[in-house]
Amino acid sequence: MRRGLALPVLETTVVSEWVDYNGHMNDAAYALVFSRAGDALMDRIGLDAAARKRTGQTLFTLQVMLHYFKEAKEGDAIAVACHLLEHDDKRMRLWLEMTAPGGERLAASEQLLISVAQAEGAARAVPWAFETKSALDALARAQSDLPHPPAAGAGIALKRKA
């Protein structure tokens, strides 16, 4: 893990099924790509399929905010990188940024996720497993110099003239 950089988690290409009547990637497709990026992150922090089966622990999404900066069109290569904004004993807040090959920002997703144990059909919040907590701590240290994204934590509102 390189210090001071967002963690690359996903590279893909915009497929025709993701393109809408406006000729660009549909808003739901962005959510799908960011969801897949979150799944890829799980593999990097000790929550891969084998660990989920062994421990019964997984992630649930509590909140998501999507930001759209520039259109992505069919055939475009896209990449998603992860900036761990903060974490505690059960939750993490991520800034996932989608870029074009030259680094141009296309979209971002801020996500609040929680550690959950699934046992006997019931889900309940639980502290991170040791391996996951260690991975999150290491990621936080490696990214401690990254600037906080200006839009992170922002809500939605219409700007009003004073």
Where are these regions (language model features)?
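HotDog/MaoC-like acyl-thioester-processing domains
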Residues: 1-4, 9-10, 68, 73-77, ...
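Short catalytic/metal-binding and nucleic-acid-binding patches
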Residues: 3, 40-44, 59-64
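Short polar catalytic/cofactor-binding loops
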Residues: 12-20
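Active-site helix/loop of acyl-thioester processing domains in fatty-acid/polyketide metabolism
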Residues: 29-53
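Short secondary-structure junction/hinge motifs that connect adjacent elements
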Residues: 48-57, 152-155
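Small beta-barrel nucleic-acid-binding modules, principally OB-folds
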Residues: 56-74
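A structural signal for short, hydrophobic beta-strand segments that form beta-sheets
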Residues: 61, 82-84
